Amino acid sequence: MYLPGFKAIAKDLDTDVSSVSLSLSTFFIGISTGQLLYGPLLDKFGRKKPLYFGLTLFILSSLSCLFVTNIDQLIVIRFVQAIGCCAAAVAAVAMVRDLFTVKESPKVFASLMLVIAVSPMLAPTAGGYLIAALGWQSVFVFLGLMAFLMLLASIWWLPESYKPDPSYSLKPKPILTNFLTVLKEPGFYTYALVSAITFSGLFAYVSSSPIVFMDIYKVSETGYG
């Protein structure tokens, strides 16, 4: 959503657009890393408490983006923001498995994947108009507000779909054993490869397009969006 603001961010932080794009790369790294962390936490503490933590972290990091004074700070905060963000993604997948049967789950997952696939295409358009009207900081205010509303909705209306398992250990050895069990399954690599191929092109375009359109071709924020 902040992609149309890369040029404005670069100007305000006295850097170049390619350096700003590193904040997007670190966000993707944070998303990948965070999913490994939240899986065990969701089994140990239930679905809602880790979700509350992640959303709160996302809100605080989004608001912190308003006060950055250099690109290094933005890159680090975007990583933290990603760690908070992926709590919702992991919890959503876990809740689908809790609440739906094996036959129903594929339909629900298909709907989730549709949202995940469409949102990166629609977000720059909304972000372009926000940035043109209110500046690039407004995007992070908007994201923080959306996360705050999600947090309230989770507290008031979202039921706990999983009873926490007190015996589940957060020690590294059993967690790594579970990961190794998954890695030994041939089917895992098939699904992982398909997912990687599907999203790699999209993310490559998303990360490089601001440099091409805004830095080289001088396209405006709304025009890029």
Task: Enumerate the predicted regions with their spans.
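Extracytoplasmic
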Residues: M1-V17, Y38, Y205-P210
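Interfacial helix-cap and linker-helix signal at transmembrane-aqueous boundaries
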Residues: I9-A10, L41-L42, A126-L134, M214
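Central cavity-lining transmembrane alpha-helices of secondary-active solute carriers
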Residues: S25-Y38, V93
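Conserved MFS/SLC helix-loop-helix module at the cytosolic interface between two early adjacent transmembrane helices
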Residues: T33-D72
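MFS-fold secondary transporters
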Residues: S61-L66, Q81, R97, S154
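Helix-loop-helix hairpin linking two adjacent transmembrane segments in secondary transporters
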Residues: T69, Q73, S111-W156
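Cytoplasmic helix-loop-helix junction between adjacent transmembrane helices
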Residues: I77-V118
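Juxtamembrane intracellular "pre-TM" segments in multi-pass secondary transporters
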Residues: S161-Y191
